[in-house]
Structure formats: structure tokens, C-alpha cells
Amino acid sequence: MVIVAVTSLLTPFFQSRSDLRPEHDIPETTQIATNDSSSNQTAGTLIMPTTIDIVSTTSAFPFVQRWVAQYENQQLASSGSVNVDYLADREISVAEGGSGRLSDLAIVGVPGKNNNSMYIPVSAQAVAVVYNIPSFPDVPSGLRLNSTTLLLILNGSITQWDDAAIKDLNPSLNLPDQRIVVVHNGGDNSDSSSSSSLVLLNQYLGHPNSIWPKNDSIAASGPAELAEMVRKIPYSIGYVDFSYAVQTKMTYAAIGDGNGDYIVPSMQSIGHSVDIALQVHNYSTDRSPSQVQQPPPPTINASRIVSDSYPIVGLYYASLSAIDDDKQEEEGRRRIVAMLDFVKWLITESGGQQTLLEVEYPPIYPGNEQLATYAKITIDTIQKSLII
């Protein structure tokens, strides 16, 4: 449990959090403090234990579960208490985009449309094309696949591993005379239910919708089962978030870019894609703070991805609900304060960004002043909308 004070709203964006510790002499349920400049007397702010609910797209599970655990551990060490309840069994579809959810915060792979949520990037997102060829080593062996060949495999037009199109890309590999088994997410059957991983994959393929092979495909219930199936089924192929591929030590392909180079997903190649292809839309500077309008969320512009950059890359976002009348009640305000505290931790270099290294994702905030400014203004906008 971690206690977060309302005064945390006023702390600088990347400020050390040691000043959030409560006074030991103050009663547990009521800490009243005000700062009277004329008398130099301090009385306190109401500090109450707060629980926030978090949901995420299932593809983000490997690092979101780490975020929640490490945030609570770090805050316990500093005598605070926000209880973060991660509803890991609830999937967020692309159509939802975090809107209409029964939670305080959602981690999503695609910003929703036609809702009032605000989106702050929290991590890179990359899709690994994973496969199981028993005669190949159980490490990233670098089977080469380009967008044309991969599309033909996934739609069932190419059915054999030793097809001429695959052999042309991999002349040094002894490809087996075996049928290809395509494993896909069972929910990836329409635009309204597609996972963010499939959205990114289809963007790379240049094909808006996926048509899975009728006779040689298997539907998994989600990314965890998809990864497990590919590991168990010989001669299978599928797609998962890179963090799942790393966590389960899967074999994944080197993917062709527009220049004819083949890039294996890694912290370096994903980070390079983010560095060169991140597109941040600036806030308008000619408005008063109360009139600031949220620009479109930052995105990865695929057309900017060049050599040495993994081509199937996007972003994960913290989807923050717009402030409504219900959230202006005392309990609602405290939950928003706690939620913003968690989001601030996610994007700090020593907090959530450091945690990403455990799944071989690159931190996206260190050295990126434009992205940090975007996040700060977004958080400030929400804070100013609160009635304290």
C-alpha cells in the first residue's frame, strides 16, 4: 500500500519522491496541513489510503505486471500507500481504446477514437514474428521474411516452409519440406476486435485486414496461449509482442525493411526506430492554460524507419479518463491524484522506464525532451481540471 498526498500534484514533474513521506506524528486517517506564509505554521493536507484499478491490453502484460509490483515496492520503502489493483484478466480491444472502462487507468496499444481520454506514451511496442522449426536452434536464428512473403504465409498462399519465395530470402538455410501452421489470436478477426499487435503487423504488411488460412491455422485465446502454441507445435509461425518473445525465449525472424535490409528485433533496433520515427504533435502555445487543447497522441511514423531500425514498431499509451462530475467528488479526486502519481513514475528514468529493460524494451523518455514536454503538459492539464 502506498499513500499519496494531494500535494503531490504540485511537485515538479521529475522531482525526487522523498518529500512525499507523511509526518510520523500525524494520525493515520486525518492529516490536515496548510502552509501559512505569514505565520510560517504548517498544517497538513488530507492523506488517505487510495486504491486505483488498472487494465491493459494483454500484449503488455509482461511489463505491466512488473510496473505494478515495482511501483508498490518502491513506495512501500518510502512509507507511502497506493494500492494498485491490476485487472490482468480483462482484455482491452482496439475498439475500446480505453474508453468506457471500469478502471482508473488503461495501458493500450492503440489510442481510441471518439472518446475523451488523454494518451501519454509509456513504452515502445514491437511485434516479433515467432516460429518453430525443430531443426533450427532455439534462439533467434534470423530466418529472413519480408512483407510480401510474410503476408502470403499468413493468408495461406504459401503453405510449405521450403517454398521458393522463402528459400530465395534464405539461401543458406536448409528449409524443411513441411507444411506451415499459422497460429493467430482468436480475437483478431475484425477491425473492432483486433489486438494492437495485429494492427502494427498489418501496417507493416500494407494490408488492412488479415485472412487466416482455413485448413492450416489455429486460433489462440490471447498472446500467452499463442506463444505457448508456437513453442509446442512443430513448423508453426505466429506473432506476439516482443516482450512475450523475450520472456518465453522464442525464436523470431529478421524482418525486411524498405531498403532490403533484414533486422532482428532487439532493444537497440527498436530504440533506433523510436528515436528516428517518433512524431510528437505540439500543444498550442497561444492559449491560456484553461483553454489548452489536447493534440493527437505521439505516434511512430513508419515512413521514417530506415536502416538498422526494426520496422514493426509502435507505442503503448497510458489512457487517462477525462474528468467528469463523478470524479470531482472527494474520493474521485484522490483516485485521480494517485493515478497521476503512478503515471509520473512510469515515465521517469529511474522508475517505469528502467523496468522496461527487463523485457529488453528501450526506455523512450531519457533524452527525449519533446516527448517529456508533451507528457508534462498533458498531466498538468488534468491536474488543473481538478477542483481542490
Predicted regions mapped to residue ranges:
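Hydrophobic membrane-insertion alpha-helices, especially the h-region
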Residues: M1-L9
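Flexible loop/hinge segments at secondary-structure junctions
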Residues: T11-I388
